[in-house]
Each structure stands twice: as C-alpha cells, then as structure tokens.
Amino acid sequence: MTVSSTVQPLKACVPEATEAADMPHHTLSKSMTFANLDQYQYWHAVGPMLGRMLSNGSYSIHKQYEYLCLFAHVIIPKLGPFPGGRDIYKCLLGGTGSVELSQNVQKLGLTARVAFEPTSYIASTGVDPLNRHTVHATLVELRAIGSASIDMELHQMLVNELTLTDREERLMSPEAISGTAWKTQILLALDLGQTGITIKEYFYPALKASVTGQSVAKLCFSAIRKVDKQGRFEPASKAIETYMKTQSQTDLYFLSCDLVDPAATRIKLYLMELDMRLAKVEEHWTMGGKLNDEETLLGLKMLQELWVEFGIIEGMRNEPERPSLPGDPDTIVPFIMNYEMSPGEALPKPKFYFPLVGIPELKIANVLTAFFERYGMPEQAAVYRNNLQTPSKDLVIATDHQAWLSFSYTKKKGPYLTMYYH
C-alpha cells in the first residue's frame, strides 16, 4: 500500500501483439547492456511483465521508462545470480530468484510493486552465507536517486534488533548455517506510485530468535518499543501482544515498516498460521473478538465470500521448507495475517493473505472479477482477466502465476487487494 502517492484510472485494454514492439521494455532492450548473463536473464525474464503492469496501470510513458530503467540499473544488479539449477543462495521469495512482482488493486486503480532481497554472488560463495552485507548499500543507492523517498533512521535502528549481528553470526557453525532452510533476514519492496516511490523494509527475525533463544514475537515487540520513544504504537502493540499470548501454537513471523519519518511510519506485524480453517481466520481477523467494529466485520464478510468462492481446502498445513513451485497442490501453503499499526491508533487493522498456489488461474480471475462487480469496482472487473493474459500462460490450466492475494478493507478506501505473481 502506498503512503502518499495517488493512482490513476485503469487502462481498459492490454496491448495487442502488434503493439508489443512499441512497449517501453521492448524499446529499451534494443540499447540496454548488462554486466553479465545473470543480469541479462533477469531483465528478459521479469522486465516484460513489469512493463505490462506499468502500461495496464495507466502510468505515464515517462514513468514507465523511469521505472523500467530503475529496475534495470539499480534493482537487477542487486539480485545476484539468476536461478537455473546452480547451487546458489536461495531467497525466501517465491517469484523469480530474488525478485517478486505484485500489484495493488483498489477503486482508484492499480499500483505496481517490486519486492526483492538485495544480494550478490558472495552469498553463494560462502563469504556472506547469511546475506547480510548488501542491503545497506542498496538503500544508500536508492536514497541517492530522484525517484525514491527514503528515510534511513528506522533501518538503522531495527537492523541490529531483528537481524543477526557479527557476533551472533559467529555463534552459528558452518553446519548450522548450511542446514538452515530460510536464510533471508531482510527484504525491500518498492511501491511504484504515479508520482514517486515509497520503500518498505521487511525484517525476518527467525535466525536471530534461534541464536538468541528468544521468540520472534519477543524480538519484535522489544524492537518496536526501542524505536517508539513517544509511545505512538504502544496501545496497538500491546493489544497484539496480549492476543498473541493466547496463541500457543502460533508465533509472529516478520515485521515491516515504511522507510519514512519514524513519526509517520506504519508498522506491520505478520503471523503464519498452519491451522487452515475459516474459523481460525475469523479468530485472527477479529483478534479473538477485540476488533469488532463495523468496518472490521464488513471486511470479514468480504473475506468469507472470497474464501468460499476460491474453494479453500481446510485442514492443518506443514511449515513450508521452500517457496511454492509450479505444480504444487493447493493444500501445501498455510495462510498469513498482518496487523497494521498507525501512530496514535489504539487498535491495529487486519489484513489476510490467501495462498492461491494450486488453484486454476481462470477460477481466480473469475472470482475476483465477480468480487469487483459486487463491490463497486467496475473498471477492475472489466480488465482484470485480460490484464492477466500472456502468450505463455493458458489460464485454463495454469495454477502457479497468481500465488498470493492479500485482502483488507476500510470505509475510506474500500476493498484493498494485492496480487503477488510468481
């Protein structure tokens, strides 16, 4: 979700094949050079889809070129080796290698997003096996460009609270490091707004929790209180902390914040739930009945509708040991929730993440088209399925492109959805 940017009305068509030669990605490819084959592969594997998202989101032609150039010159060099059967560092994201595209959908229109884990070849050679040493340089470079608005203070305060220090990394044996399924500790996400970029940082404290013997929840709440000297987040944070103490089988998963002035940021706390039942979703959405206002309950009604229409299969899930892959069944992935805290707000706002891997693409598109029609989003209903079509995807049989769907609701903005593409 963008903090300050505005979005424009949707474009009611997808460029035809005859127009592909005029699209910015194709034009830039004629004169774009790269330092190595990995960067070339990322550009041609991910760039075309990013280009379509910008075009379909009615970005100005100038913004399309600006953001594609940013992707090529700033982001791609920070993605490390391109995946392809080699024994390389594996990112937590389920997109292509170290990058994942997503798109915010709301009544006002579409916003493209790029999430990635800054990395380099040294994460694969053993020099930086836990990939700790690329993110800071990436943030400095992003701050230097004119497109992005970024405040480094929260990064500087949170990085040692939620990720391994040098001393803590030395406590891990080489065998423990190599045997760790998830090594990701930080991700970045860029909301590509119509007027500029907002940057979010995601902290995954599981490694630090393991080394220090603390729970992820304890690390997160402690970190929030250390950076929140004015107590702006204390009421909402305390409400979440109290609720999480009732969940004996569920810990927090990760924390995110907007890299803006700490007084204006939002902080989100995420949990991963293996109990894949609608009753458990309802419990988390309302925080056991603590969130019972009209807005929250109307959002829950919409969530329940989507749950039924997607045909989510209920039951216990296993904790995933890898990102989802094409061909995985629709019973492999648990669900994720987050609680968004805003300065001065007494209670958080819930957001739910539907795992969609294994569900046919056409079914997902049809469910969302009908949802948009029901809730006053006719432009989205008119174009969603067409925007999804690509020459390489048959929506009737594909089951791996639309991987996750987040959902939240407020009276002010209405339904707010983000589709994560793999």
Swiss-Prot record:
Annotated protein name in UniProt: Roquefortine prenyltransferase roqD
Biological processes, Gene Ontology terms: alkaloid metabolic process
Consequences of knocking out this gene: Leads to a drastic reduction of both roquefortine C and meleagrin synthesis. Accumulates high lebels of HTD.
Function per UniProt: Roquefortine prenyltransferase; part of the gene cluster that mediates the biosynthesis of the mycotoxins roquefortine C and meleagrin. The first stage is catalyzed by the dipeptide synthase roqA which condenses histidine and tryptophan to produce histidyltryptophanyldiketopiperazine (HTD). HTD is then converted to roquefortine C through two possible pathways. In the first pathway, prenyltransferase roqD transforms HTD to the intermediate roquefortine D, which is in turn converted to roquefortine C by the cytochrome P450 monooxygenase roqR.
UniProt gene name: roqD
Induction (UniProt): Expression is decreased in presence of phenylacetic acid (PAA).
CDD domains, sorted: PT-DMATS_CymD
Source taxonomy: Eukaryota, Fungi, Dikarya, Ascomycota, Pezizomycotina
EC number(s) from the headed UniProt entry: 2.5.1.-
Pathway: Alkaloid biosynthesis
